[in-house]
From Swiss-Prot:
UniProt-recorded name of the protein: GTPase Era
Family: Belongs to the TRAFAC class TrmE-Era-EngA-EngB-Septin-like GTPase superfamily. Era GTPase family.
CDD domains tied to this protein: Era (cd04163), KH-II_Era (cd22534)
Binding-site residues for GTP, renumbered to this chain: 14-21, 61-65, 123-126
Origin species: Listeria welshimeri serovar 6b (strain ATCC 35897 / DSM 20650 / CCUG 15529 / CIP 8149 / NCTC 11857 / SLCC 5334 / V8)
NCBIfam families: era, PRK00089.1, small_GTP
Length: 301
């Protein structure tokens, strides 16, 4: 007789840049969470769905927890903390190469107040010696009663199968919430805007901070050629940032568009014509109506 089907919700938390999105994308096998080495790149709860014959795990990738500096930051932290209460299991991801930091202390204090079981995932183990890894495990073991402590490399996939096995063991019998072939519940528009934003952050590096939002104005399909036309607007806070994104003779914007288009085509499996505009909206991160317009919906959280 076959085992009963199991399912559950798992939150992935940790301070910025520890590899949460990399882990989620490795498990799902497709890029659904924006990846960049800048802090705070994941803004909304991106759900990834991992389904096998035995179980379904719904992953919630939360923003990196940090001390908020403005309304957007405050909003991001609130999402992460609310998520702790809603899930069946929490992955607390840390970066082995940077060791214990104040950000980790802040998260552990929050985790002490929840009943949800917590897995400590020590990521980037390929960057430290076994001796240092052992010391790190001992250090964290004294801070919280973790359900499991699992060293991994999210980038290379080391020990991820073991992590999924342990996760399954902690799930309850439950329904299949999503169709087997569905990997995220985020609408395509959201993922397309995130793919464009990822290229902006990667190509402009430190020059353009997180005062960037991307709004998809329209998606049209040509019935004859099946080609998609996507109109997008990049929103920044200052005209200097607009200049950086457009670049000399429009070269930077061209690069952003070219790279984003390839990612979008690979996601949607069809040819895309991508048109991008850049618009200045001063201090949008501190104005609630702008946050709502750019996809940050307070009602949802």
């Amino acid at each position: 007789m076959s085992e009963p089907f199991k399912s559950g919700f798992v939150a992935i938390v940790g301070r910025p840049n520890v590899g949460k999105s990399t882990l989620l994308n490795h498990i799902i096998g497709q890029k659904i969470a924006i990846m960049s080495d800048k802090a705070q790149t994941t803004r909304n709860k991106v759900q990834g769905v991992y389904t096998t014959d035995e179980s379904q795990i719904i992953f919630i990738d939360t923003p990196g927890i940090h001390k908020p500096k403005h309304k957007l930051g405050d909003f991001m932290v609130k999402i992460a903390l609310n998520t702790f209460q809603e899930v069946d299991l929490i992955y607390f991801v840390i970066d082995a190469s940077t060791g214990f930091g104040r950000g980790d202390e802040f998260i552990i204090e929050k985790l002490k107040n929840v009943q949800t079981p917590v897995f400590l995932l020590i990521n980037k183990i390929d960057l430290i010696s076994p001796e240092d890894l052992f010391k790190l495990i001992e250090q964290y073991r004294e801070l919280l009663d973790f359900e499991e402590i699992i060293p991994i490399s999210a980038l290379q996939g080391n020990n991820v199968p073991n992590l999924l096995e342990q996760t399954n063991a902690n799930l309850e019998i439950g329904p299949m919430y999503y169709p087997k072939d569905q990997i995220t519940d985020h609408p395509e528009r959201f993922i397309i805007s995130e793919l464009i934003r990822e290229q902006v952050l990667q190509l402009t590096r430190e020059e353009v901070p997180h005062s960037v939002a991307v709004v998809i104005e329209g998606i049209e399909k040509n019935p004859k050629t099946e080609k998609l036309t996507i109109n997008a607007t990049i929103i920044v806070e200052r005209s200097t940032q607009k200049g950086i994104i457009i670049g000399k003779q429009g070269q930077m914007l061209k690069q952003i568009g070219m790279r984003a288009r390839k990612e979008i085509e690979s996601l949607l499996g069809s040819k895309v014509f991508l048109e991008i505009w850049v618009k200045v909206q001063k201090n949008w991160r501190d104005k609630e109506h702008y946050l709502h317009d750019y996809g940050f919906d307070r009602e949802e959280y």
